[in-house]
């Protein structure tokens, strides 16, 4: 394959500078002329004798071009009536040089072992004798495309290595030469390329074609070898006009004939050489099958054509030496050796879909493979190099970062690194052994060669890297030592064998000495030998071992003198043995100077054996040693790493390992000692801190299955080594290890919501393990055979397992003590092997699929009932095949598609409709062996398949995909593949676990293949369907029984909310790093408390027929940035509240609500024409990228939906001409993207080197924009060339004299000025033309988060809440005259209630609207010096909403300590009571019977235990009392308003007089659990048998409800009933219990309704008269809030999943509503039941109940 610098193609003439004639040669008549056809310069070579007139590359025959591209493209034209010759010298893999010649001089094909001669005829006349001869008079320019790999493979049975030289001989014109690994099609246009799976010729290589003409009418394309199958024994006869180019194949051998095509070809693909069967006469017997056949026939089965063209088949596998496939590296290719089974991707398949590559190897979990002795320090001691099966890993020990060397297709058996970290040598284990030399710094493979040894066991570099020695076995099993010269490899040369030697002595270790590169040492059974390379001969001499001659030596190491003396006399050799001996050998005298033996001796009571250095008896088996100038590190089979002084007087340090130590290596600085164990552990001991650091752990046998847990980012693997291991995906470190000595684990899966995983074993047992306690929780043994499949539903309520005996088990996992529900025999195919894809659950949890009851059938069942819904006979799918097909693995696609994918034994993946069983499409030729695992991404874009030792990725979304991308790296078959929960990574497991990054961004407007058209929504819905919603969870067709199918829902959410599993990126949810930066830099999303099931199954219905309609939104997202826009000229005013864009008429107060975002909106931008509004939200759990919605302002419809960044969008801005939209990612994403507003396609994107806090277009020049960040201003210049836009960057640092710190805001002033705000409160002024800061002044004490300029005035807003107006008209003059802050003065100042985050002003900056972090929007008038509240909301969580008796007002309380009274009609703030430094936790409004309206009062409970009474009419606090020692949780008035009941978090209920402030009764019945609800009503039911005027209840967090009858005027209180509900052991609501809520039924005084964290998610209806539960209403989740409508039989329930459910208790139906961005913790009907208030954190939504 072509090296990276030769990819995708190489211009040979340009690279070797032919015009200079320094690296090339010319002879005879060679000149540069201008060709009229090509309209450019070409080289003319002419002369009567071809051999005397030529161009040769390279100049000298002793040099080599070293071009490894598979295809050579020769662009030439023969001179009329002349002969021409083209000679190519090609080197094979075994370094044999073969000349390949093409000429019209040759009359027939000739072949020798070193020369191939092909006749090339460019005109065909009728007589055969005229076929060979002179070029025609009208010879045309020709593209000669030679497949050098096929030429050598077919005709000489050799494997192509590289192109060594080229000679172009007279007479011809030549334009250029190119090499490439890609098969280009020269005559394909752009339109044809879009429809055909071919790669067009690059523009640089293409011939010019005038408009309206055909390429084939002007030029000739010759492809050799061709796709032709048969070649006649005589020359081909053609009579064609215009002339054809014909390459004549060999006469006597009917091998494939080269074909030249000068007519359009319907399907032009890569050349395919097909070797006919050996039985055919005249076939080349020695030619192996070079390439498998590729069929691009248009014939398709009816099933494949049902829904569009099928996938093009991939060719079968073959035993190849070279193949063009993807590796794990980003876009690189590798040359695999001949014994590797690797897929031969059809040329062009690498270009099949973009990005290419779509996967990039990020991390590897594993160590060793062939052995665990290969682990090295880099010379600088910063990294460790070790093999992980076929991958070489370089691990930075301080950061844990990995990089990889990829290309080996079998386990790496030996490694060596030179002393300068320049060259890395590696060898792979499978015979015959292939070796590679790598550039260690770049990771590029410099050389690949076959070792003379059959198996390489050890490698050693000289310190300079010029000599490499290897030890191994030849094919007879004899020990062999080889020395290679590697000095010329880095200069383009090759590895040279310097010497070879066979020896009968055993060699276990071999080292080149550091003091002399010609000397080496080896040790083995009974021998220690010193070697020398001299005169091309390796000779060795034994060391006299004396009495130690029978020892089994295992390792050796040289000790360098402390003074660094390089003399041999200064070096000593240490050798260790399996008997515990360590010999110190003088290399100069070749004698043993000291012999020591390490023996274990046990002291009384000692925990470990002590060591003594010399004695008799059994010693400690030493496997490895390493020596530094000060100490010797010894690794032994008893699991200890010991550090000794060089005199071995005593142990300095020791570290015990979990297994025998197999290798030790002291770092170059001597401070760290690397150790590896045979149990797969790799780590190092820090000698200074005496701390052992684990670097890598590994399974010691192939991994069978894996599973991922989303919340903690953990991975579980099971292996043939009988262990179950839990890994941290972020660090790739092992967290837990569960081992079973008798029972082998087979399958594993995580519980979706709890810290638990399930594992199936070979005995048939299924066990659950706790990740918190690291122990087995429950075990079930309902299977008789080994467990073959294990999977759970997405909600975690059900678990399924299958076994090798064919049984299927269903478990209930609603509680930790999970139990068996059903066991069905003979369901699953009994002889199916264990596979991660043996069982599959649909992503909505409703369907279960598996292979069974026979191999030929796939069964689909209802997951809850196990009712059989579908059975598909796979064996009857392919009627054209005589072989009975069988199913191997199954997986479901996204719920929206309804696809079920089945891999079969006939190398296909069949896509079925999961409901009807209809064949939707088919992917043929996936892999010749069974596929054990396959999975489809959440957005249905990529299909991942385990294909032998490779991973294949298909573009599933494209019906006519040309083929997959193939990735190597595994040395054993891949057992499992899976996408990570966020879809941004892929895991593959086999010999090791590989973690791959998915490089493809989420496509914004991509729809599911075959997905049904979107349902039309209500008035608030736009024409664009939410791609993110379709990419994850689609609305359920049914809600849980007994509710009917959910009718269409209201327009509060114009699209299905993308809550998905509710996981959110909360990295920015904490407090900002510094106070002033909170309002200056980034959008900080509100703390999200949504559960992982957020909005799953909700569907936004239209307004018609809905039960609720969103009327108003109370609040403003003060944590956004620039999330308010106002245009005074049009009156357009919009701001954000949670996920909603609120468009409000400032005159009437009427609101429109634009919905569809799946997360909280961070920022807004209005186009300069005021016709388009862009809104951006953060990333939700269902979308890997954030959303930007583009709205039509006039219609309120979403016109475009794009997904620009993987993190939150920090800023948006339209260009002055509204042709571009710039988006800026936050400090994690740091991406700047430009979008064309015509189609909103991505125009340009760049990764920023550091966090940026703001971006703005130059209003005077649409081609310039500016970013500000950490101490720099970045100017971007936009250069447009056609449709492409490139960015030129210029960075200017902030002058040190300014001392501004971080730049946090910016705005353009009068040309050419730019104003920048800083985190320290300064404003800097820049000259954008000169790129310098010429003025700064201190504008505030806090960070400047906002700047606006118009005319000659500048507005600044800071984190201190100050809004200041500056006169800056004189600043332009200061640019030339010099700076002076005295020329800038402040005109006005206003202090607002929070940090300024958004602002819009009119052109004169006289009035504007300003938003603050307090959730307030202010109208500011500079002329009047006033600020007026426009929008006011709570800045923190709203705890309660209550209503006045006449329903004219409502009141809210919040954790910010405020009680606010609102006018209900306009939702304008009327009164606010504020208590500093306290949280107001509960609130109650006095009932209507307490007196006249002017005597209405509010009772508010606070966190300090106080209860305050406020007078609404007098707007004053009347009374403060302290009835509780701890925080109040709920408060209520009695029906007459003369008594207040309050509950606290300790479970006490206090009864107080609001007039006197006395507490006259305290009830402690609920003590120990917080009181969550107190509900008071008039006692209407006389059947209760108790006295009293009031009936009230108290509910506490321990699932208990007490019901009381009271008459407080008589001081009477009597218990009516006591209810206790079962308490679950754990909960599904984020680790804390949902509240226990109860309320009296307003339409039936005898009924009580209760919700809480019970065993089941339901509403319990209890009859107080009958003393029993009369009804239960199921819920999808645990309730967080509850409210009953006084006027109708409606029940409102809020959930932590950001969802609201309205239940009609009379009809038994329900509707779900979305719109909140957080848990709906509060819902309250107004007394008239006409309105419903819901609250999520600090946002309040007001809903109208139509029909009342």
Swiss-Prot record:
RNA-binding recorded as keyword: no
Localization terms from the record: Cytoplasm, Cytoskeleton, Microtubule organizing center, Centrosome, Centriole; Cytoplasm, Cytoskeleton, Microtubule organizing center, Centrosome, Centriolar satellite
GO MF entries: microtubule binding
Principal place of residence: cytoplasm
Region (Binds with microtubules): 1-207
Keyword terms: Cilium biogenesis/degradation, Cytoplasm, Cytoskeleton, Microtubule, Phosphoprotein, Repeat, WD repeat
Top-level taxon: Eukaryota
PROSITE patterns: WD_REPEATS_1 (PS00678), WD_REPEATS_2 (PS50082), WD_REPEATS_REGION (PS50294)
Keyword Oxidoreductase tagged: no
GO CC annotation: centriolar satellite; centriole; centrosome; ciliary basal body; cytoplasm; microtubule; plasma membrane
InterPro entries: Beta-prop_WDR90_POC16_2nd, CFA20_dom, Quinoprotein_ADH-like_sf, WD40/YVTN_repeat-like_dom_sf, WD40_repeat_CS, WD40_repeat_dom_sf, WD40_rpt, WD_repeat_EMAP
Coiled coil segments of this chain: none
Residues with the Phosphoserine modification: 241
GO biological process: centriole elongation; cilium assembly
Residues covered by region (Disordered): 274-308, 1004-1071
WD repeats: 407-450, 452-494, 501-541, 615-654, 656-695, 698-737, 740-779, 782-821, 882-922, 926-964, 969-1009, 1156-1201, 1204-1245, 1247-1286, 1298-1326, 1327-1376, 1433-1472, 1475-1520, 1523-1562, 1568-1614, 1715-1748
Function: Microtubule-binding protein that plays a crucial role in ensuring inner core protein localization within the centriole core, as well as in maintaining the microtubule wall integrity and the overall centriole roundness and stability. Required for efficient primary cilium formation.
PANTHER family named among the record's database cross-references: WD REPEAT-CONTAINING PROTEIN 90, WD-40 REPEAT PROTEIN
Family to which this protein belongs: Belongs to the WD repeat WDR90/POC16 family.
Protein name: WD repeat-containing protein 90
Gene that this polypeptide is encoded by: WDR90
């Amino acid at each position: 394959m072509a090296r990276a610098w030769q990819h995708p193609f190489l211009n040979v003439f340009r690279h070797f500078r032919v015009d200079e004639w320094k690296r090339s040669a010319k002879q005879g008549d060679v000149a540069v002329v201008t060709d009229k056809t090509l309209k450019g310069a070409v080289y003319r070579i002419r002369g009567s004798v071809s051999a005397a007139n030529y161009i040769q590359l390279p100049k000298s025959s002793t040099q080599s071009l070293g071009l490894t591209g598979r295809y050579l493209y020769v662009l030439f034209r023969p001179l009329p009536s002349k002969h021409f010759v083209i000679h190519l010298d090609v080197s094979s893999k075994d370094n044999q040089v073969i000349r390949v010649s093409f000429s019209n001089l040759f009359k027939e094909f000739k072949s020798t072992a070193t020369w191939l001669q092909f006749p090339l005829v460019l005109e065909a006349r009728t007589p055969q004798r005229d076929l060979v001869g002179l070029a025609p008079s009208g010879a045309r320019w020709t593209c000669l495309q030679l497949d050098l790999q096929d030429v050598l493979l077919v005709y000489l049975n050799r494997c192509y290595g590289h192109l060594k030289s080229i000679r172009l001989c007279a007479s011809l014109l030549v334009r250029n030469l190119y090499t490439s690994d890609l098969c280009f099609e020269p005559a394909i246009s752009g339109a044809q390329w879009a429809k055909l799976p071919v790669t067009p010729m690059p523009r640089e290589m293409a011939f010019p074609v005038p408009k309206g003409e055909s390429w084939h009418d002007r030029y000739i394309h010759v492809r050799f070898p061709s796709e032709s199958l048969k070649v006649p024994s005589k020359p081909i006869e053609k009579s064609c006009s215009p002339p054809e180019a014909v390459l004549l194949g060999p006469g006597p051998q009917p091998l494939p004939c080269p074909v030249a095509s000068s007519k359009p070809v319907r399907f032009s693909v890569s050349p395919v050489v097909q070797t006919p069967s050996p039985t055919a006469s005249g076939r080349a017997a020695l030619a192996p099958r070079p390439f498998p056949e590729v069929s691009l026939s248009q014939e398709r089965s009816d099933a494949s054509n049902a829904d569009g063209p099928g996938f093009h088949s991939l060719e079968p596998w073959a035993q190849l030496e070279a193949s063009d496939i993807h590796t794990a590296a980003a876009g690189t290719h590798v040359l695999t050796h001949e014994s590797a089974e690797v897929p031969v991707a059809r040329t062009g398949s690498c270009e099949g879909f973009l990005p290419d590559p779509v996967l990039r190897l990020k991390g590897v979990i594993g160590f060793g493979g062939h052995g665990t002795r290969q682990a090295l320090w880099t010379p600088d001691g910063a990294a460790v190099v070790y093999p992980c099966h076929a991958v070489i890993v370089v691990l930075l020990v301080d950061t844990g970062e990995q990089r990889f060397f990829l290309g080996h297709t079998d386990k790496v058996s030996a490694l060596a690194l030179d002393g300068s970290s320049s060259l890395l040598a590696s060898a792979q284990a499978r015979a015959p052994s292939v070796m590679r030399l790598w550039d260690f710094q770049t990771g590029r493979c410099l050389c690949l060669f076959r070792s003379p040894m059959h198996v390489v066991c050890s490698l050693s570099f000289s310190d300079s890297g010029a000599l490499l020695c290897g030890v191994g076995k030849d094919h007879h099993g004899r020990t062999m030592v080889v020395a290679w010269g590697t000095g010329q490899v880095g200069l383009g040369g090759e590895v040279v064998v310097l010497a070879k030697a066979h020896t009968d002595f055993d060699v276990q270790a071999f080292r080149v000495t550091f003091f002399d590169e010609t000397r080496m040492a080896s040790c083995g059974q009974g021998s220690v030998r010193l070697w020398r390379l001299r005169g091309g001969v390796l000779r060795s001499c034994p060391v006299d071992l004396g009495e130690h001659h029978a020892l089994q030596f295992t390792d050796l190491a040289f000790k360098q003198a402390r003074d660094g003396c390089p003399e041999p006399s200064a070096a000593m050799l240490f050798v260790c043995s399996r008997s515990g001996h360590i010999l110190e050998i003088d290399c100069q005298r070749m004698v043993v100077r000291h012999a020591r033996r390490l023996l274990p001796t046990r002291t009384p009571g000692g925990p470990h054996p002590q060591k003594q250095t010399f004695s008799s008896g059994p010693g400690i088996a030493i496997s490895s040693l390493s020596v530094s100038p000060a100490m010797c590190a010894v690794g032994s089979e008893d699991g200890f790493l010991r550090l000794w002084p060089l005199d071995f007087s005593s142990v300095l340090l020791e570290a015990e390992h979990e297994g025998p130590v197999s290798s030790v290596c002291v770092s170059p600085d001597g401070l760290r000692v690397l150790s590896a164990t045979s149990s797969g552990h790799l780590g190092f001991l820090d000698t200074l801190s005496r701390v052992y650091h684990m670097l890598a752990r590994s399974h010691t046998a192939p991994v069978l299955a894996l599973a991922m847990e989303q919340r903690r980012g953990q991975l579980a693997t099971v292996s043939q080594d009988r262990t179950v291991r839990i890994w941290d995906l972020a660090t790739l470190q092992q967290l837990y290890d569960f081992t079973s000595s008798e029972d082998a684990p087979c399958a594993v899966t995580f519980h979706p919501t709890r810290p638990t995983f399930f594992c199936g074993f070979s005995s048939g047992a299924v066990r659950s393990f706790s990740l918190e306690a690291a122990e087995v929780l429950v075990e079930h043994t309902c299977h008789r055979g080994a467990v073959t499949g294990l999977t759970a539903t997405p909600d975690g309520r059900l678990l399924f397992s299958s076994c090798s005996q064919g049984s299927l088990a269903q478990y209930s996992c609603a509680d930790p003590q999970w139990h068996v529900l059903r066991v069905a025999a003979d369901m699953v195919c009994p002889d199916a092997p264990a596979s991660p894809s043996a069982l599959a659950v649909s992503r909505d949890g409703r369907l279960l699929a598996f292979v069974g009851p026979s191999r030929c059938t796939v069964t689909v069942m209802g997951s809850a009932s196990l009712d059989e819904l579908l059975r598909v006979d796979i064996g009857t799918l392919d009627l054209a095949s005589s072989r009975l097909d069988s199913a191997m693995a199954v997986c479901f696609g996204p719920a929206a598609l309804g696809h079920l994918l089945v891999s079969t034994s006939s190398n296909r993946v069949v896509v079925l409709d999961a409901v009807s069983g209809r064949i939707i499409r088919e992917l043929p030729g996936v892999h010749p062996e069974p596929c054990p695992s396959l999975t489809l991404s959440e957005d249905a874009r990529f299909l991942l398949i385990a294909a032998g030792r490779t991973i294949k990725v298909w573009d599933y979304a494209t019906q006519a995909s040309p083929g997959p991308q193939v990735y190597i790296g595994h040395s054993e078959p891949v057992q499992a593949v899976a996408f990570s929960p966020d879809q941004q990574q892929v895991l593959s497991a086999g010999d090791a676990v590989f973690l791959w990054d998915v490089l493809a961004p989420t496509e914004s407007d991509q729809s599911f293949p075959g997905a049904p058209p979107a349902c039309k929504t209500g008035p608030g819905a736009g024409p664009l369907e939410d791609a993110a919603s379709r990419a994850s969870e689609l609305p359920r067709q049914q809600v849980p029984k007994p509710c009917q199918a959910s009718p269409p829902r209201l327009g509060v959410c114009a699209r299905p909310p993308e809550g998905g599993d509710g996981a959110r990126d909360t990295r920015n949810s904490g407090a900002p790093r510094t106070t002033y930066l909170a309002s200056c830099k980034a959008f900080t999303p509100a703390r999200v408390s949504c559960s992982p099931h957020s909005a799953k199954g909700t569907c936004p219905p239209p307004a018609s027929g809905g039960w609720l309609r969103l009327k108003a939104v109370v609040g403003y997202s003060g944590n956004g940035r620039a999330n308010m826009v106002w245009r005074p000229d049009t009156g357009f005013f919009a701001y954000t509240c949670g996920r909603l864009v609120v468009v409000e008429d400032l005159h009437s107060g009427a609101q429109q609500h634009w919905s569809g975002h799946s997360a909280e909106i961070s920022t807004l931008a209005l186009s300069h024409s005021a016709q388009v509004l862009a809104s951006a939200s953060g990333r939700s759990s269902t979308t890997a990228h954030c959303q930007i919605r583009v709205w039509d302002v006039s219609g309120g419809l979403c016109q475009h939906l794009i997904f620009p960044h993987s993190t939150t969008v920090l800023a948006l801005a339209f260009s002055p001409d509204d042709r571009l939209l710039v988006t800026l990612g936050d400090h994690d994403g740091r991406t700047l993207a430009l979008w064309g507003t015509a189609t909103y396609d991505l125009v340009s994107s760049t990764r920023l080197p550091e966090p940026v806090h703001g971006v703005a277009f130059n209003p005077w020049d649409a081609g310039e924009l500016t970013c500000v960040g950490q101490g720099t201003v970045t100017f971007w210049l936009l250069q447009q060339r056609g449709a492409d836009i490139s960015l030129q960057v210029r960075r200017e640092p902030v002058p040190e004299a300014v001392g501004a710190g971080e730049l946090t805001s910016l705005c353009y002033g009068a040309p050419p000025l730019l104003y920048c705000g800083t985190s320290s409160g300064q404003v800097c002024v820049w000259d954008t033309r000169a790129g310098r800061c010429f003025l700064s002044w201190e504008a505030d004490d806090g960070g400047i988060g906002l700047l606006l300029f118009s005319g000659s005035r500048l507005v600044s807003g800071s984190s201190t809440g100050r809004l200041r107006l500056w006169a800056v008209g004189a600043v332009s003059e200061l640019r030339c005259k010099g700076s002076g802050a005295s020329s800038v003065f402040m005109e006005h100042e206003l202090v607002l209630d929070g940090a300024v985050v958004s602002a819009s002003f009119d052109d004169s900056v006289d009035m504007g609207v300003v938003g603050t972090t307090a959730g307030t929007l202010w109208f500011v008038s500079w002329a009047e010096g006033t600020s007026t509240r426009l929008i006011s909301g709570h800045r923190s969580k709203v705890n309660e909403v209550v209503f006045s008796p006449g329903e004219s007002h409502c009141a809210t309380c919040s954790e910010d300590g405020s009680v606010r009274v609102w006018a209900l009609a306009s939702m304008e703030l009327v009164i606010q009571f504020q208590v500093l430094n306290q949280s107001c936790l509960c609130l109650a409004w006095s009932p209507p019977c307490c007196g006249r309206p002017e005597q209405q009062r509010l009772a508010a409970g606070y966190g300090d235990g106080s209860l305050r009474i406020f007078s609404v009419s007098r707007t004053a606090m009347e009374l403060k009392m302290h009835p509780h020692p701890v925080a109040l949780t709920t408060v209520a008035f009695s029906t007459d308003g003369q008594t207040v009941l309050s509950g606290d978090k300790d479970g006490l209920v206090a009864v107080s007089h609001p007039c006197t402030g006395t507490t006259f009764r305290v009830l402690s019945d609920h003590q120990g659990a917080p009181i969550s609800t107190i509900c008071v009503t008039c006692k209407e039911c006389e059947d209760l048998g108790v006295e009293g005027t009031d009936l009230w209840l108290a509910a506490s967090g321990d699932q208990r409800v007490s019901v009381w009858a009271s008459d407080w005027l008589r001081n009477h209180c009597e218990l009516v009933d006591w209810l206790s509900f079962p308490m679950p052991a754990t909960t599904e609501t984020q680790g804390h219990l949902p509240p226990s809520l109860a309320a009296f039924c307003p339409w039936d005084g005898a009924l009580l309704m209760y919700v809480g964290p019970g065993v089941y998610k339901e509403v319990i209806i209890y009859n107080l008269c009958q003393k029993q539960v009369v009804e239960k209403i199921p819920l999808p989740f645990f309730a967080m809030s509850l409210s009953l409508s006084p006027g109708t039989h409606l029940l409102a329930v809020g959930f932590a999943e950001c969802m609201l459910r309205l239940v009609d208790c009379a009809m038994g139906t329900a509707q779900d509503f979305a719109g909140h961005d957080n848990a709906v913790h509060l819902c309250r009907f107004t007394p008239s039941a006409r309105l419903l208030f819901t609250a999520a954190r600090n946002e309040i939504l007001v809903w109208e109940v139509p029909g009342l």
